[in-house]
Amino acid sequence: MAAHRSGPLKQQNKAHKGGRHHGGGSAQRDSKGRVGPKILCKKLKRQLSRIDQRHRASQLRKQKRESVLAEKRQLGSKDGPPHQVLVVPLHSRISLPEAFKLLQNEDLGTVYLSERGSTQSFMLLCPSLKHRWFFTYARPGDLHTLLDMAKVADTILFLLDPLEGWDSTGDYCLSCLFAQGLPTYTLAVQGLSGFPPKKQIDARKKLSKMVEKRFPEDKLLLLDTQQESGMLLRQLANQKQRHLAFRDRRAYLFAHVADFVPSEESDLVGTLKISGYVRGRTLNVNSLLHIVGHGDFQMNQIDAPVDPFPLNPRVIKSQKKPNMAMEVCVTDAAPDMEEDLKVLMKADPDHQESLQTEAIPDPMEGEQTWPTEEELDEADDLLKQRSRVVKKVPKGTSSYQAEWILDEGDESDGEGGEYDDIQHEGFMEEESQDGSGEEEEEECETMTLGESVRDDLYDEKVDAEDEERMLEKYKQERLEEMFPDEMDTPRDVAARIRFQKYRGLKSFRTSPWDPKENLPRDYARIFQFQNFVNTRKRIFKEIEEKEAEGAEVGWYVTLHVSDVPVSVVEYFRQGAPLIAFSLLPYEQKMSVLNMVVSRNPGNTEPVKAKEELIFHCGFRRFRASPLFSQHTAADKHKFQRFLTADAAFVVTVFAPITFPPASVLLFKQRRNGMHSLIATGHLFSVDPDRMVIKRVVLSGHPFKIFTKMAVVRYMFFNREDVMWFKPVELRTKWGRRGHIKEPLGTHGHMKCSFDGKLKSQDTVLMNLYKRVFPKWTYDPYVPEPVPWVKSDISSTVSEVDME
C-alpha cells in the first residue's frame, strides 16, 4: 500500500513571524535566492540625504533665477534686440498722442528718435536704465495690424479709460488677443488725474473690479505725468516676460526699413531688402521666410549693417541736447553703414529649402484610387444606357466593401448635392406659429425706437437680401437641432442612386473603415508623415540642442528676399507693418490640418460647413472652406453641418503644414467688409487619415403594428430601393432595433421585424454613412478688413424677422 504524499496545492498555513527578532539569515532563507528588482538594475537610483535634497533644490532655484535675469538683461540691452512695446488704446476717448508724449520722458536721460519713414513708432533709449524700447501702436479696429503686431511684440501696453475701461471695440480686440496668445502685458489708466481727489480713489476701485474679469490680480498703473511715465518705463524694463510657444522655436523679425530692387525681367517682381532685429532663434539664410499676409519666399543673403540705434552712442556725450545728439549720430553713421556693410551669409543652393508646396503624382505608379475624368464620363454614359444599376468593384475589395461601393459619377464628393438642402417647409410654418408669446412680447418691447426715427430711415440700414439669406440659415440650423441628420427620401430619384456613396454600419464606433479607401484626387497633391508626433519631437529637439549657423538673436541684419512682388513694399510704404517668420522644415508643404475650436460666445450667427472662413493659424493667415466634425477619441468622427455652441469641434482643411502648438482664430467676412470672430482654438494635428463621416438618417412611419412585426411606409417609394437597403439595420427613436424582412407591393411598403413591440407614435430610422473630404479652397490672400464696429441693427432685425 503506497503512503500518502501531499500534492503541490495543499493548504499552507501562515508562518509565525518573529517580529524584531527576525534576523537577516532567516530573510535570506525565506527569499530562496530570489533577487529584488532594484539589484537587477544596472543603474541604482541613489537616495539623496536630506541635506543633499535641500542643496539640489537651492541649486535649481538659483538656475531658474539666473535664467530669468539673463533673459531680462538681454531684452532691450546693447547686446539684445530693443524691447518692442505695442501700445493699444482700448477706448475711443484715449488720446494716443498725449500718451506718446509722456512716454518720451527726458527726466530719466532718455533719448527720443523718430523712426524714419514711419509716424507710427519711435525708439526710446535710456542709458541710465541700460535699456532701449521700440514703441509702436495699433488701433483696436484695425484687426490685421493689431494681430500681426501682437505676434512679435515683447510687451503690450493697454491704455484704459478711467470710467469705462474699454468700449465694445476694445472688448472685441481683447477677445482676439486672448485667443491668439497674449505676451507680457501692462495696464495703464489715462485721464484719472482730471477727477477730483476724492473721486479718484473710488474710480480706481471701480475700475479694478471691472478689470478683474479679464486681468485677475493685475496692478493698474497711471499715465498722466512725467513721474508716472518713468514708473511705467521701469515696470516695462523689469517685468518678467511671458513666452508664446509658436514664436519661441522660430526666428522672426519686424521690418524697420524696407527697400525694393526690381529684377531685370520685370518691374513687378524683384528683391526685397528688409532690415530689423533678429528675435526668437538664430536665422539661417537657407531656411524659408514667411512674410505674414504675403506668402513664403527664399533668401539670397543676409547682411550685417551697423546698428542704427545703439544704446550708448559716442556723440551723445559731447552734445547738450539729447535729441540733436541722436540726429547727428545717425546722419554721421549713414555713410559708414554703407562702408562697413558686411555680408553675413549667402544661400547655398544645395542646402536651401525648396518652395515646392504640392506633391507631383506619377500616374504610372497607380497612386490614385479615384477615377479619371474620362472614366467618370464613361460611367455616366453606361448609367444612361442601362436600366439597372451595375456595381463596379475595385480589384481586391472585400465583400463588405463591395456591398456598398457603386459607380460614383452621379454624386459630387461634397456635402451631398442639392438634395441635402431639402427643408421641411410645413414644419417651419408650424414652428413660426407656435413660439412662446410672452418671450416674443418681451423682445418686441425691448426694441423701442424713437418716434423721430422714421421707418424709411431705418430700412436704409437693412439689407433685404441679407435678411432673407440669414433667415434661411436660421431655419436650417433650427431644423438640424430638432431633427439631426434627417433627410426626406427623394421621390424623383431612386434612393439607391441618390445614396449610392453611402453605406450601412453595424456600429459607428466599432465597425471597420479603411482610411485609404476611395481617396479623392486632391490627396495625391499633399504630403503625409509616417509619424507626425515623432517628426515634431525630432525637429524641436534639434532646435534646442543643435547650434544653428546664421544671424544671432539681437543682431541688426538686412535680409535679401528674392522673387517678391512689388505689392509687398507698397503695403509697407502705406504704413502697414511688415513681419517675417522663418519656417521649420516641411512647413511650406500642403497637408490636411485638424484644429480644435470652440464657438465664440459673442457671435450667434449660424455658420454652415464648407462656408468660406478666414483662418489665423499661428503666424499664417489664409482663406478656406472647412469641414466640421465632432471631437472624439474614436477612429471615425461624425460630420457636423453647423457650428455648435455647446461643445468643442474639429475643423478640417487643406493648408500648409504647421507644427503645433499654434493658436487658431476663425473669422467670417461680412458683406460690409468687416471680419467677425466666429471661433477660437488651437492646432490639433496634421493627419490626412482622420476620417470625417457624414451621416444621413432616412425616416419611415409604422403603418400597421403587430407583436414584433410592423409595416413601415414613407421611407422608400419603390420595391427596388427596399431590396437594395435590406441588409441595413433599422432603429427607432424609442430605442427599438430591427431589420427589413421583405417588401410589400410596389410603392415602398416593407415588412420589418423588431426586438420589441413598437408604439404608434414611434418613428423608424435608417442610418447611412459616407466619408467626406475637405475641398481644395486654400487661398493665402486675405483682403484687408474694414475697421470693426459693433452693429446691433442687423442682429435685432434678424430676430424680428424670425418672429
UniProtKB/Swiss-Prot annotation:
| Subcellular location(s) per record | Nucleus, Nucleolus
Cellular component terms (Gene Ontology) = nucleolus
Concerning PROSITE patterns, the annotation shows:
G_BMS1
User: InterPro entries, from UniProt?
Assistant: AARP2CN (IPR012948), Bms1/Tsr1 (IPR039761), BMS1_TSR1_C (IPR007034), G_Bms1/Tsr1_dom (IPR030387)
Identify the Pfam families for this entry.
AARP2CN (PF08142), RIBIOP_C (PF04950), Tsr1_G-like (PF22298)
Q: Where is the composition biased (Basic and acidic residues)?
A: 65-76
Start and end residues of each Bms1-type G domain = 81-242
Q: Where does it mainly reside? A: nucleus
Q: Does the keyword Nucleus apply?
A: yes
- For bias kind Acidic residues, which ranges apply? 428-445
Keyword Plastid carried by entry: no
Instruction: Give positions of region: Disordered.
Output: 1-83, 428-447
Q: Where is the composition biased (Basic residues)?
A: 13-23
Which example biological process does GO assign this protein? ribosome biogenesis
Name the keywords, alphabetized.
Nucleus, Ribosome biogenesis
Q: What family, per the record?
A: Belongs to the TRAFAC class translation factor GTPase superfamily. Bms1-like GTPase family. TSR1 subfamily.
What does this gene product do?
A: Required during maturation of the 40S ribosomal subunit in the nucleolus.
Q: Quote the protein name from its UniProt record.
A: Pre-rRNA-processing protein TSR1 homolog
Per the UniProt entry, what species is this protein from, by scientific name? Answer: Mus musculus
Classification lineage: Eukaryota, Metazoa, Chordata, Craniata, Vertebrata
